[in-house]
Amino acid sequence: MPELPEVETTVRGLRPPLEGRRLTRVETRRADLRRPFPADLRQRMTGATITGLGRRAKYGLIETDRGDVMVFHLGMSGRWRIDPSEIGAHDHLVLETDEGRTLSLCDPRRFGSVDLVRGEELAGFGPFKALGPEPLGPDLTGAHLAGALEGRVAPIKAMLLDQRIVAGLGNIYVCEALHMTGIAPTTMAGRIAKKRLDRLVDSIREVLAAAIEAGGSTLRDYARPDGELGYFAKQWRVYGREGEPCHCGTVIRRRVDGGRSTFYCPKCQK
């Protein structure tokens, strides 16, 4: 599933062809999606000018001069394509601009979603109501984590994946940040000292910034809007590296909890 760096990279890639441009055509191409498109999407978006693009957690935001915000989630396999050579069966949404550019939202597994929300109602949009602070913003601090995790007996990894505590983190980058900080993923969250949480916040930011710089991590379907892959997988410290040596020489291990793989070094992470 695309995580924060992949969504941020996608948003940045969509800005050049979309920002400041008027949509001359909006076509929804499938009615049997898991989450159907809003019935009035074409009516409200056709003719609108895109005034800005942003991100909240793992959601992309496309703002218009009409006060609407198109909120998209890439699901498991979604990605945007700029000027595709052809529109395929998995291109479920197609946008055309007054500059003659074509953008398509391709989602083979159909777990993604598109919603249309009034800008003034965005904070109350269902998935956004209980989101925690953005990990790259000023509100995520060691003090915030200390307060949110106080008394919690759940593993730190599970807590970091809870979007109510930190918005946008996913499996890859939590594994990487915990390894960088030297915290075992099974450590009970409420027992971690404030100083270690301060370092954890720094590690989260460092990992995410590096991933965005590399264009995210391509696993199967993800690619940037221009078709380029994400190359952060070449920098993974532990994720996806079961049986390979950590930088300390210890063999990296994998455990499975709730169907999700966790990668860690038993020596470096305590």
Curated annotation (Swiss-Prot):
Keyword set, alphabetical order: DNA damage, DNA repair, DNA-binding, Glycosidase, Hydrolase, Lyase, Metal-binding, Multifunctional enzyme, Zinc, Zinc-finger
Cofactor annotation remark: Binds 1 zinc ion per subunit.
GO MF term list: 8-oxo-7,8-dihydroguanine DNA N-glycosylase activity; class I DNA-(apurinic or apyrimidinic site) endonuclease activity; damaged DNA binding; zinc ion binding
Gene3D superfamilies per the UniProt record, alphabetical: 1.10.8.50, MutM-like, N-terminal
UniProt xrefs under NCBIfam families: fpg (TIGR00577), PRK01103.1 (NF002211)
Family (UniProt): Belongs to the FPG family.
Protein name: Formamidopyrimidine-DNA glycosylase
Lineage: Bacteria, Pseudomonadati, Pseudomonadota, Alphaproteobacteria, Sphingomonadales
Gene name as annotated: mutM
